[in-house]
Each structure stands twice: as C-alpha cells, then as structure tokens.
C-alpha cells in the first residue's frame, strides 16, 4: 500500500504555548511533533476611512499595519487584487482587524514559517454563520467568507472551514437550494480573486442546523471547490451516538468516496456529550463515548490522505494522544503481518550448529552401558629412580606392582566439646582514694578533732 500523510494538529494556538501569536503557535505545534494547525478567524472587525493624501497612487498591498479588504470608489466596490489598482482621491478603504496579523506582510510571513516547518494551515471562519437567515445576516455571513478567503490567500492556507446556519422556517429541500445558490456565488468570487483555498462545509451537531452528512455531500457534488469537513463528534451526536466500531467509520468514508473523488480529506475529532440527537458540549476524548481506537484501526488499514484537527478542550494534548494511538495500532499491524509471513512463506533457517547423530543401540534396543572411568595415573615421586625388579625365570614376565594404598584417614575421636565460656561479669569499680581536702572551716561550725597517730616504739640498744 502506498504511503500517505495523516496529519494531526490543534484547532487554534496550543494551550501550552508561552506566546499567544500565530507565529508562536506554529512553532510550538512543530515542537510537539504535530504537523497541522487550524487558525481561528473568529474575530472580524471592519473599519472604513478615506484614503490619505500620502497613500494616493499606492496599491492595497503597500498599506502598512492595515489589511485592506475592499475599496469603494463612488460607493462601488473595486477589486483589491487588480495589479493596476491605485488609490485615488476620495476612495474609501475597508480595513480588517482579525487578530491574526496586521497587514499582508504579516500573513505572508506566517505562511512562510508554516511552510518551512511543514505545518499545514487551514482557516476557520467565524462560528456564527447563517446563510438562511435574514438578508442582512446572510450578506454579512457571505462577506465573512470572502474576508476569510483573502486572509487564506496570503497565509497559503488550503482550507476555509465554515458552518452554514439554522434551517429557520425553511423546509429542508428549500434550505438546500438556498445554501447551494449562496455558496455558488462565494465560490465564483473566490475564483475571480484567484483564491486557491477550498471551502470546507462542517457537519453540524444539532437537528436545527443545516449540515447532515447527506446534505453536505449533495451541496459539494453540485458546487465545485467545496468539500465536506468530517466532524466526527458532530456526526456522532446528530445520529444518536452511532460511531462506535471500525465498520461505522468505514461506512462514513465509503459514503464520501462514492459521492466525491477527493484525494485529501479533512476532519475534526474530540469527545462529545449529546442527548436526543443534539450535541451538548465537546469533552476530552477519554471522557466521551466515542473512542478514537476504532477510527485509528480503520486509518491503519486504509492509510488515507487526511488531516485530523483536535476540537477537544485539551487541544494539542488530545492531538498528540490521537497520534500515539495511531502509531500503536500501526506497529501492532506490522507485527501481525510479520508473524503471518513467517508462518506461511518464510523459509526455515538451518540450525547454527550441526545436529549430532543418534547413538547406536545395543542388544534388545537398549543403549550400551557407560564405560567405567579408569583410575587416574599415579604420579612418580621426584628424586631417585626406583630399582627395576627382576623378571621371573619361569614366565619371563615382571610381577605386577601392587598399587600403593593411600593411608586411611584417622578416625575422629570422640572429643568432648568444650563448653562455651561464660561471659565475664563486669567487676565492681574499686573505690578511688582521694587525699583529704584542705578546706577552711566555715564560721559557726565545730572543729573536728584530729586523731593522734602513735609512733612506732624505738628498738632498745643491745648490751655489750
């Protein structure tokens, strides 16, 4: 099976990233071993101003610290991507502040960093999109898709992900036709502006929002440049928790392949809490009832070209968790294939050492008795050579020498064992004689009478 790329990444700047800019986020994604990132284009702030005198004669890409998304000349929009477009006096500039970058140079630099680090970029349009609402809300939603496309062009992003909105009072068939018409206009505008990013339609997780998998496939089939975004937690919640086995995920992929011929797929994954066919909230993968292991088993078998974005509250942590699970399943499959090859087609290797021939059997199928070990040779004592004994006259043979007997070891006498010595008791300390201390009598005390020592009697002199 040919090798393909399965990419993992977070939906936004990683939580563990110390910096909060898109540059920091992309570098942190690469450091974590991930290779995809979905930039959140969720804040759209538009400002209008007249062109300054020093800007007359310049183009939209030459404006510093501002991103010009539209030029109104006589209250009519002018394409901002025309190479010969120059500002004139009285023009009104529409500038965008989105939190991703300040101007075109910032977007281009971010895209170059991602390309150097092999991090695939995508862009998520504002979450509140309602193509089936009132005319004002629908126009604002399509404008947000256009602005997202302009940013994606400078970033080099490959996908603009969007929701589609509520059904409202529209029947499902009528809602389908309206969505197709509006998305067709946006896609044609993308083509005129030479925006290569595809528009990804995300599956919805609630019954009141347009976006079942069948509706998305119908829209993508009728409008070119649109692809479905396989949001597995949304599909799992909308259908009542059906994605539990590897075969369940296989059915989803087979349905997409039958309808569309797509080389690369795009998806979201996380845990989800749901009730009555409606999504309640996203959860970490381990806390939801939809496990990643069945999807990993399918991916390891089919090896499709797909990007999986973590929508979990843990973002990059669950993205790394999914990558580890997939690698484990792949290693397990490789080990299984190698074992089967050994059983079926691998030749038996010869033994390293030759096998000894079997021993010959004796009579009646019994093995021969082992030979008795001979006596060890007697070493001759160093010194003079022993005299040769004369041979007998009768036979002419020398008499056999008797083998010298080894002296028998003396028998051990029954020596009574000595009793263990009794432990010595510690001797009493001898009193230490101290000289009498010469102390002065205290006043008022009685003097102590000293004992008289009798002197020894002198010897009497001898008489002469």
What are these regions (language model features)?
Residues 14-16, 173, 210-213, 229, ...:
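Gly/Pro-rich active-site loop or hairpin
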Residues 29, 124, 152, 199, ...:
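Conserved, mostly hydrophobic/aromatic
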Residues 350-464:
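Intrinsically disordered, Lys/Arg-rich low-complexity segments
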Residues 11-15, 40-44, 126-130, 165-167, ...:
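Active-site beta-loop-alpha junctions enriched in small/polar residues
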Residues 4-8, 33-35, 115-121, 155-158, ...:
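Short, well-ordered coil/turn segments that N-cap beta-strands
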Residues 1-125, 131, 136-142, 146, ...:
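N-terminal pre-domain/capping segments
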Residues 38, 161, 229, 268, ...:
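Conserved beta-strand positions in the central sheet of alpha/beta enzyme cores
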Residues 115-116, 126-230:
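Active-site acidic/histidine proton-transfer and metal-coordination neighborhood
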């Amino acid at each position: 099976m040919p090798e393909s790329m399965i990419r993992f990444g977070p939906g936004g700047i990683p939580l563990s990233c110390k910096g909060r800019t898109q540059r920091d986020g992309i570098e942190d994604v690469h450091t974590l071993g991930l290779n995809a990132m979905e930039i959140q284009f969720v804040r759209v702030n538009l400002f209008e101003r007249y062109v300054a005198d020093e800007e007359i004669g310049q183009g939209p890409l030459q404006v510093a610290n501002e991103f010009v998304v539209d030029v109104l000349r006589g209250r009519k929009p002018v394409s901002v991507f025309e190479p010969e477009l120059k500002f004139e006096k009285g023009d009104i500039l529409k500038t965008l502040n989105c939190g991703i970058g300040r101007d075109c140079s910032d977007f281009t630099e971010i895209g170059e960093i991602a390309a150097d680090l092999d991090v695939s970029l995508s862009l998520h349009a504002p979450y509140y999109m309602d193509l089936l609402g009132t005319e004002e809300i629908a126009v604002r939603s399509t404008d947000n898709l256009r602005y997202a496309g302009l940013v994606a062009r400078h970033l080099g992003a490959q996908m603009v992900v969007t929701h589609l909105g509520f059904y409202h009072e529209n029947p499902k068939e009528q809602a389908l036709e309206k969505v197709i018409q509006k998305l067709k206009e946006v896609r044609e505008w993308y083509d005129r502006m030479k925006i290569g990013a595809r528009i990804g339609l995300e599956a919805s997780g609630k019954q009141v929002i347009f976006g079942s998998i069948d509706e998305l496939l119908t829209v993508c089939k009728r409008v070119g440049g649109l692809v479905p975004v396989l949001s597995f937690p949304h599909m799992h919640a909308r259908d009542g928790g059906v994605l539990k086995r590897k075969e369940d995920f296989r059915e989803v992929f087979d349905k997409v392949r039958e309808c569309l011929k797509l080389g690369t797929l795009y998806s979201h994954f996380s845990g989800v809490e749901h009730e009555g066919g409606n999504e309640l909230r996203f959860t970490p993968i381990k806390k939801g009832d939809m496990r990643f292991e069945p999807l990993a088993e399918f991916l390891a078998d089919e090896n499709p070209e797909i990007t999986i974005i973590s929508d979990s509250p843990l973002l990059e942590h669950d993205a790394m968790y999914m990558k580890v699970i997939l690698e484990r399943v792949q290693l397990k499959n490789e080990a299984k294939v190698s074992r089967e090859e050994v059983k079926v087609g691998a030749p038996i290797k010869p033994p390293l050492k030759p096998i000894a021939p079997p021993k010959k059997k004796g009579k009646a199928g019994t093995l021969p008795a082992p030979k008795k070990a001979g006596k060890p040779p007697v070493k001759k004592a160093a010194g003079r050579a022993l005299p040769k004994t004369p041979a007998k006259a009768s036979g002419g043979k020398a008499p056999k020498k008797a083998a010298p007997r080894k002296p028998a070891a003396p028998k051990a006498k029954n020596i009574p064992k000595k009793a263990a010595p009794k432990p010595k008791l510690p001797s009493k300390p001898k009193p230490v004689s101290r000289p009498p201390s010469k102390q002065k009598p205290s006043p008022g005390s009685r003097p102590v009478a000293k004992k008289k020592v009798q002197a020894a009697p002198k010897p009497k002199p001898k008489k002469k």
